[in-house]
C-alpha cells in the first residue's frame, strides 16, 4: 500500500513537471514566432529578426520569464527566483516570476524596468526603459497594477498599486500613476492626470513626451483656475 502510494505520488509529480515543460516550451515557441515582428513594428532601429532574438534584452527577459513563471506556478520558487535573478543580471530587467506577461509584450531598451509579483501585463503592451510596475502595500494579495491590451508605458514612468491601466492607454514619460486610467486615455505628470483633448495636440508622436506633458497639464490647470498667463 505504501509503495503504491509513493509510486502514484511520483507519477503525479512527473506528470506535473512534464506539463509545465510542455506549457513553457509552447509559450517560448510562440514568442520566438511573434516577438521579432512585434519589436520591428515599434523600433525603427531593428535590422533583422535574428538581431531581435539574439541581442535585444527585452526579448531575452520575456523568454527567461516564461521559464521562471512556469517554475513559480509549479511551486519551485527558489529555482524560479534563480532564473529571474540570472535574467536580471544579463538584461538589466527585473520581472518577478509570479508576474503574468501576455503575448507580444515589447520591452524597449529595458534597462531598469521592474515588474512586481502580482502585476498583470496583457497582450501587445509596450514598456520603455526605467518603468516600475510596483506595489504600494506590504500585503500578500494583489498589490501591483494590471496593464490592459495595447497600452504604452513611457520612459521612467511608475505605475503603483493594484490599479488598472485601460486598453490602448498611454502613460507619459516620468509619470507617477496612482489611480486607474481609462481605456484610450493619455496621462502624464506627478501625480498623473489625464491630458485633455486640447492638450493632446501638443504631444508629439505616439508616446507622450514628459516636457510636453508637463506644459500641457500646467496650461489646462491654469486655464481652469483663471490664472493669467504670460505670453512671449
Tell where the protein language model's regions lie, with residue ranges.
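Extended alpha-helical regions
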Residues: 165-168, 173-232
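Terminal amphipathic alpha-helical/low-complexity segments used for targeting or macromolecular assembly
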Residues: 1-91, 202-232
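Solvent-exposed, flexible loop/coil residues
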Residues: 50, 57-58, 63-66, 99, ...
